[in-house]
Regions:
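Rossmann-like NAD(P)(H) cofactor-binding subdomain of soluble oxidoreductases
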Residues: 1-68
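Alpha-helical elements of the RecA-like P-loop NTPase motor core of helicases
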Residues: 16-20, 87, 180
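Glycine-rich beta-alpha junction loops
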Residues: 37-41, 62, 83, 107, ...
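Internal alpha-helical scaffold of NAD(P)-dependent oxidoreductase catalytic cores
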Residues: 48, 52, 69-160, 214
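N-terminal first-folded block
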Residues: 129, 220-223
Length: 224
């Protein structure tokens, strides 16, 4: 194989297996081996390092779904590993239009959990909102169309002013009666009710809100 850089873009559980399968097939001295896992470190490629390669993990903070090819322009890539491999990875990221930054090995699991909150779990939250919409007599298709403007504005607010200044609704106002009303009606959608209580508690912990003690009592009176 004449390539100087090999980038293993395989499921996490298969990275070490793929590296092992290639270990004896290539003369690794002077080559660069990368993998694209967000949760695992460059040590998954240790067997190639032992054979003379320099290795790194290179992960884009971006969502990829079947049939979609998102632009990588401006996308941040977290990189860690051997110094020489990181230099190569940074050049590759730049060529892709992204921006690379360093991450410590010990921080990768938390980094990947962060990304999971930012996209897959956000999608799970949106699926939950569709169930609440159904309780209000709104179909899934209609709910998606009607939610899109508020979702886009919420993300725009977050991007422009951050979470605290972009927060709105009954919790920031300390509207105990409305929160109580929500919790009562959500008894008919128990999974959504659990999510509501968990997120409301997070809001009281991390975001500005009036009547925090009263809101906490309401949430405590409606255990999930």
């Amino acid at each position: 194989m004449h390539a100087n850089v090999l980038w293993f873009c395989v499921p996490d559980a298969e990275i070490a297996l793929a590296a092992r399968s290639f270990a004896g097939k290539i003369r690794w001295k002077g080559k660069v081996a990368l993998h694209s896992s967000g949760a695992l470190t460059s040590d998954e490629l240790a067997i190639l390092r032992e054979r003379g390669a320099v290795v790194a993990s290179v992960h884009p903070m971006m969502t990829f779904v079947r049939g979609s090819r998102p632009s990588l322009a401006g996308v941040p890539f977290a990189v860690e590993g051997d110094t020489a491999a990181i230099r190569v990875a940074r050049r590759m990221v730049k060529d892709l239009g992204g921006s690379a930054y360093s991450i410590r090995k010990k921080d990768k699991a938390a980094y990947h959990a962060w990304g999971t909150f930012a996209s897959p779990l956000l999608t799970a939250l949106l699926a939950t909102t569709e169930q609440v919409a159904a309780a209000a007599g709104v179909s899934r298709k209609a709910a998606r169309a009607r939610m899109t403007p508020i979702l886009l504005q919420t993300l725009a607010n977050y991007a422009e002013v951050g979470a605290a200044s972009g927060f709105s609704g009954p919790i920031i106002r300390g509207d105990v009666d409305t929160v109580n009303r929500h919790l009562r009606v959500l008894r008919g959608v128990p999974a959504a009710r659990e999510v509501y209580v968990a997120l409301a508690r997070a809001a009281l912990q991390y975001l500005p809100a009036k009547n925090k003690n009263a809101l906490k009592r309401v949430l405590d009176s409606h255990p999930s």
